[in-house]
């Protein structure tokens, strides 16, 4: 008998650092609280006031840039790809973005959840639908594409 805890995986910061090449200040996923094989994942970003982009976006009313929400989605998707295709031997390139929508601002103190679901995979091309949520409310969404390449071919 399997319950959700045994079927779904997670990734703490150390595992994310093994899966992704990103490092501070561009690592935008603090933890992955749920990974369902190569089908879906939920990544977490705890937004803090001392992140470098807030010094200029905007000093009097800091708002997380939308492009960084998209990057957090892409990094969560990249973790799915890296786990499935082999850590260390491949690179995951963010390829496409479609249907991006920004619904509400994300500010310091928010906890963003990146909900990423694989829509299709053909060869080394993966497509995902992504939602970013704060307190259960949709703040951004996009469809993104990724390409898996061997480090030898990169």
Curated annotation (Swiss-Prot):
Function, in words: Involved in unsaturated fatty acids biosynthesis. Catalyzes the dehydration of short chain beta-hydroxyacyl-ACPs and long chain saturated and unsaturated beta-hydroxyacyl-ACPs.
Leading EC class: lyase
Gene assigned in the entry: fabZ
Protein name, entry field: 3-hydroxyacyl-[acyl-carrier-protein] dehydratase FabZ
Catalytic activity: a (3R)-hydroxyacyl-[ACP] = a (2E)-enoyl-[ACP] + H2O
Classification via SUPFAM superfamilies: Thioesterase/thiol ester dehydrase-isomerase
Residue positions of the active site: 57
A Pfam family that the UniProt record links to this protein: FabA
